[in-house]
Design a protein with these regions (language model features):
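N-terminal basic/disordered segments at the start of proteins
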Residues: 1-38, 58-62, 112-115
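Cap/lid and interdomain-hinge subdomains that line or gate substrate/regulatory clefts
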Residues: 1-4, 30, 56, 64-74, ...
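Short glycine-rich or small-residue beta-strand-to-loop segments that form or flank ligand, phosphate
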Residues: 2-7, 42-50, 73-84, 195, ...
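Short acidic, glycine/serine/threonine-rich loops at helix termini
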Residues: 16-18, 87-91, 118-126, 176-177, ...
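A structural-propensity feature for long, helix-poor, extended segments
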Residues: 39-48, 301-304, 386-418
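Conserved, well-structured core segments that form the ligand-binding/active-site neighborhood
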Residues: 128-295
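C-terminal structural cap/anchor segments
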Residues: 296-355
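Conserved, well-ordered active-site substructure
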Residues: 349, 358-406
Length: 418
């Protein structure tokens, strides 16, 4: 088996690649077709979570063609474990397009990532002890999640038929799950939504779906797939796939407004120089990025990297909506972050620790990094990565991932420390 993964944003790519590497699979991550050497998995990193459906599907099918040409024979559409996708979202249409392209009538819907508190019970997605719709994800600026029932979300996006395998079946093991799958297939179900409470459930599901040419989900299922691959191949986890992270000029850029990112920013502000982005300047001042870059460069003599952040609380976001009206503040901030990244790279800043999927995409694109070595995980779902030419070392973190101390912990890994 050579696994081909299509991930819908940069941080999601790092997330799943890290789990595959931890599971022993030699993994290459890229954002465009490249010559891939010897590997067990290829992760194609796209930025399609919040773009128009037609363009998202087009990019996915192009990525699929590349992965097929690269010798992949099993495929994994990776989206966020919080299923970031409203009624106008792309998960349903992309899943439909992949099923059609691969000529498979049925696939799996498995967003769960128990290690980070994302579980599914009776088809409802939970974030720790809260329904998704009751969690801070209801305030997400791009994809506010107001429903927790996965089948309802998918039905609002796609005419495909949805079915469930509930926890009472999962608990009976892979043979029972296979039987349930066959019954759902016979009933014409296209998307099988599976309950997952813990990592053991993921192993059961991975074993039961080994003959699926296409699965979809968060990164949790990758743990199960890697585990099964390791059992079948007889190979051990290859820790040599990781690299030693070097201390270099660095910056922390926080663009996410997630609840965890807010906690991480608040914690890190007590430890290192920090600068809150001025939204008005992002909109009006084309020279603002130069001012911010100068500030970052002035603070390179600290033990911990200076932080530039646009992280805001829900009340602050609401104030901004009232203040700026129809102005596209998010786009202006991203454009500023892109200019900032370019200016810092010109001044030999080589370590970028980035919080937020959209912001991570902007930074990686600006740096022109399109293929990566995957390092050891900092926290579940987040690893250091290095550009293949060694020029840049990056942390591309989903806003919700990582511990409160994450931004500090990432830098404690310099020079081989753990």
């Amino acid at each position: 088996m050579r696994l081909g993964v299509i991930a819908d944003d940069f941080t999601g790519s790092v997330d799943i690649a890290g789990f595959l590497v931890a599971g022993g699979m030699r993994t290459i991550m890229c954002s465009r077709p490249v010559v891939v050497g010897d590997s067990d998995a290829i992760v194609m990193s796209l930025k399609i979570r919040s773009i128009p459906k037609s363009e998202a599907v087009k990019q996915v099918l192009e990525a699929l063609a590349f992965l097929q040409q690269a010798g992949c024979d099993r495929f994994y559409y990776k989206y966020c474990s919080t299923f970031d996708s409203t009624s106008e979202g792309n998960i349903g249409p992309i899943t439909d397009a992949l099923r059609e392209a691969l000529n498979c009538s049925t696939t799996l819907i498995c967003p769960a990532l128990p290690v980070n508190g994302r579980t599914v019970f009776h088809g409802y997605l939970f974030v720790k002890d809260e329904l998704l719709s009751d969690s801070p994800m209801r305030h997400h600026p791009l994809n506010p999640m107001h429903d927790s029932k996965l089948a309802r979300i998918l039905s609002s996006q796609s005419p495909a038929k949805n079915g469930h395998i509930y926890y009472d079946v999962i608990a009976k093991g892979s043979i029972a799950v296979r039987k349930a799958i066959e019954e759902l297939k016979a009933d014409g179900v296209n998307n099988i939504i599976v309950d997952v409470i813990d990592d053991e459930d993921l192993l059961v599901i991975a074993e039961a779906t080994e003959d699926f040419s296409l699965v979809t989900g968060g990164s949790g299922l990758a743990q199960g797939i890697a585990h099964r691959w390791r059992e079948r191949s007889g190979k051990a986890a290859d820790l040599n796939a990781a690299f030693v992270v070097e201390r270099r000029k660095a910056v922390v850029i926080a663009g996410s407004c997630s609840a965890m990112m807010q906690k991480q920013v608040a914690y890190y502000k007590k430890l290192a120089p920090s600068l809150s982005i001025n939204e008005q300047a992002c909109l009006d001042d084309p020279e603002y990025a130069k001012i911010v870059a100068a500030w970052v460069l002035e603070h390179q003599d600290q033990v911990l990297a200076p932080m530039v952040y646009a992280t805001r609380s829900p009340s602050e976001l609401e104030e901004n909506r009232k203040k700026f009206g129809d102005a596209d503040v998010s786009s202006a901030i991203e454009q500023m972050f892109s200019r900032l990244t370019g200016l810092l790279a010109d001044k030999k800043v080589q370590n970028f620790i980035v919080g937020g999927g959209e912001t991570s995409g902007v930074v990686a694109t600006t740096l022109g990094v399109d293929a990566y070595l995957i390092g050891r995980q900092i926290d579940p779902g987040v690893s250091w990565v290095r550009s293949l030419d060694g020029a840049y070392q990056l942390v591309l973190k989903s806003g919700n991932f990582g511990s409160v101390e994450f931004l500090e912990k990432a830098q404690e890994m310099y020079d081989g420390n753990h």
